Structure formats: C-alpha cells, structure tokens
Swiss-Prot record:
Keywords assigned: Acetylation, Membrane, Transmembrane, Transmembrane helix
Protein name as it appears in the record: Transmembrane protein 254
Modified residues (N-acetylalanine): A2
Originating organism: Pongo abelii
Classification via PANTHER family: TRANSMEMBRANE PROTEIN 254 (PTHR34104:SF3)
Subcellular location: Membrane
Residue ranges crossing the lipid bilayer per the database entry: 15-35, 61-81, 95-115
Pfam families (UniProt xref): TMEM254
GO terms under cellular component: membrane
Signal peptide positions on this chain: none
InterPro entries reported for this sequence: TMEM254 (IPR028110)
Bilayer topology annotation: Multi-pass membrane protein
Length: 123
C-alpha cells in the first residue's frame, strides 16, 4: 500500500506555463465569442492573422475551441485514472489533479505522468 504522503501527492505546475495557457485560452475565448471587440490593429502580427481567421474560418475556430475543452475533459479523467494507478488515493489530491489538469491540460498531466508513485496491485 502507498505511504500516506504518496497517497496525498499533489504538485502545482509551473507558473510560467499556467500563465501562458491562461492567456492563450483567454485570447482564444475572446476571439471565438467577442471577435468584434478585438483591437486587431494594436496586436502587431497577431492582429491581421487573427482577423483573417475570424473572417474566413470562424466555424473552424469555434469547433477547435470546443474540441480543446473536450480534450481537457479527457485529460482530467485520465488524471483520475493515473492517480489511482499511482497510489494517490486521497480524494482531495485527486480533485486537485482533476481541476489542475482540466484548466491547464498537458502542463499538469506531464507532472502526474512523471510521478513514480507506488502502483496499486490489480485484483
């Protein structure tokens, strides 16, 4: 059986990656739902590129947005499975892994994948 510390293992991810992901997803949300309010001319090279995507591929942007969230849901569910497989049995720790992976995706999941916890015996 896993140790008490291993059963409650949780590690917060890199602040750098969390900031990058938050800003990127925030910008993506802005582009998908409020494209008319974006100051394209003030965004440097990103402005004309974003405007082109909004004008010519808005449906693709919307579908990609929802697909990204669906992938985050899948990653979160996989994080729960990994927690159980690696001996992280604390409900609080599992919830933290689920939420962190839901909001930050692979940046969180790679930390959990790298964790070398005790594996539970399968019956």
């Amino acid at each position: 059986m896993a140790t008490a510390a291993g059963a409650a293992y949780f590690q917060r991810g890199s602040l750098f990656w969390f900031t990058v992901i938050t800003l990127s997803f925030g910008y993506y949300t802005w582009v998908v739902f409020w494209p008319q309010s974006i100051p394209y001319q003030n965004l440097g090279p990103l402005g004309p590129f974003t405007q082109y995507l909004v004008d010519h591929h808005h449906t693709l942007l919307c579908n990609g947005y929802w697909l990204a969230w669906l992938i985050h849901v899948g990653e979160s569910l996989y994080a729960i499975v990994l927690c159980k497989h690696k001996g992280i049995t604390s409900g609080r720790a599992q919830l933290l892994w689920f939420l962190q992976t839901f909001f930050f995706g692979i940046a969180s999941l790679t930390i959990l994948i790298a964790y070398k916890g005790k594996r539970q015996k399968q019956t």
